[in-house]
């Protein structure tokens, strides 16, 4: 399963992400218009075994791909979830060019929502 690059538009959420079962590749993309790293990504492998955590700051998009048969996350968020406030960017945006570790993954499973996201250029998402 791959969860595309998603975010809250009016209520940006910071997330401290930890995996308590399985393994994922977790990604954050900077969407702060005045940032020198706007449109750049950072990713880490998080697993129950390595016990790493990743902080995704507010005004960043967040995505992940599950690398194990199953995975469970724990999030600590800075803002409540607002389902009507969701936005996103296509997971394979060529300008962002996330290097997803997809070796050994036969089929990428995306939600209907994630299939509809446009590129960063097309969506013009900036904070």
Predicted regions and their residues:
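Conserved SET/PR-domain catalytic core that frames the SAM/AdoMet-binding pocket
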Residues: 47-64
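Non-catalytic, conserved peripheral segments adjacent to functional cores
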Residues: 1-50, 68-70, 75-127
